Amino acid sequence: MHIRILGSAAGGGFPQWNCNCRNCRGVRDGSVAAQPRTQSSIALSDDGERWILCNASPDIRVQIAAFPALQPARRPRDTAIGAIVLLDSQIDHTTGLLSLREGCPHEVWCTQMVHQDLSEGFPLFRMLSHWNGGLRHRPIALDGEPFAIPACPRLRFTAIPLRSSAPPYSPHRGDPHPGDNIGLFVEDLDSAGTLFYAPGLGEVDEALLEWMRRADCLLVDGTLWRDDEMLACEVGDKLGRQMGHLAQSGPGGMLEVLAKVPAARKVLIHINNTNPILDTASAERAELDASGIEVAWDGMHIQL
C-alpha cells in the first residue's frame, strides 16, 4: 500500500493567511524552524498507478502539481485519481471537489450523513451535477464490514464511526450523528499492511483502541498540542474538544493514547498552525521524537 501525504495542516493551512501567531509569523520571517503545509488530504494506492483521494482539500490543485503520479499525462486530459473518499463534510476536506469539476464524473464514497450535508448545507452534489454527470455518490455503510473500491481492488476499507463534530454549517452541529465523521482502517491484501487513518478524532474509547492496535501505521489527529491552545494564542474562543479534536498533551490526550498502541509508525496529521510541534526546535517536538511519534509533512510517502 502506498500512502502519500498531500497536505498535513488543519483548516487554513500553515501559515494561515490571516494569522500572526508565533508559528505563522515565524515561518514567514524564518525565525521558526518550520516548513509550510497545505490543508490535509492523502492519497492511497495498491499499485502506485491508480489512486484513491481521501478528502479533497481546498489546496488540491497545488497538491496534484506537487505529486506527478496523480497526473500521468497518458492522454490530452488525464488523472490517476480513480475515486474520492470523504471522511467528513468539513469545508477544508470537501471544497477541493470544486477544483476537480473539469474531471467529472467522480465516484465519491461517503456516509449518508456526509452526503446529506453536501446536498443541503453545502450542496456540492447538486452544484456539480451540471458538470458532466457531477459526483456519483457511493454510500459507505457503518456496519463494520470491509468494502472494496474498484480503483484499487487490492485494498479493503472499513469505516469506523468517530466521536467528533459535524461542520459549523451542518444543521446537526450540536447534535452528533453516527457517520458525521469516520476513520478508515485500510488493509492491503497482498502485503497485509494495515493503516488506521483519522484526521479528525475527538475521543478514543476502548473499541476504537482495538482498531488502532491492529494497524501497522497510525495517521491520526494532530490538530492541537493543548486543549486551550486557540484561546492561549488569542486566535479563537473554543477548546479543542469543542471542535471535535483530542489534544496531544494532558490527561487522556493523544500522547497517552498512542503509548497504548504497538504500531510501528505513529504519525500526526491535520496540524493546526498554532501547534508548537510544527517548530522542529520546540520542546514539544522533542517530546514527540522521544516517544517515536512522527509529524506528517507535505510530500511524505509511506509504504506498507
Swiss-Prot record:
Pfam families the record matches: Lactamase_B_2
User: Which keywords has UniProt assigned to this entry?
Assistant: PQQ biosynthesis, Transport
Q: What does the function comment of this entry state?
A: May be involved in the transport of PQQ or its precursor to the periplasm.
Q: In which pathway does it act?
A: Cofactor biosynthesis; pyrroloquinoline quinone biosynthesis
Q: Which family, according to the similarity comment?
A: Belongs to the PqqB family.
GO terms under biological process = pyrroloquinoline quinone biosynthetic process
Q: Which Gene3D superfamilies match?
A: Ribonuclease Z/Hydroxyacylglutathione hydrolase-like (3.60.15.10)
Entry keyword annotation includes Isomerase = no
Sorted alphabetically, which PANTHER family does this protein's record hold? COENZYME PQQ SYNTHESIS PROTEIN B, HYDROLASE C777.06C-RELATED-RELATED
What protein is this chain from? Coenzyme PQQ synthesis protein B
State the organism of origin: Pseudomonas paraeruginosa (strain DSM 24068 / PA7)
Q: Which HAMAP family match?
A: PQQ_syn_PqqB
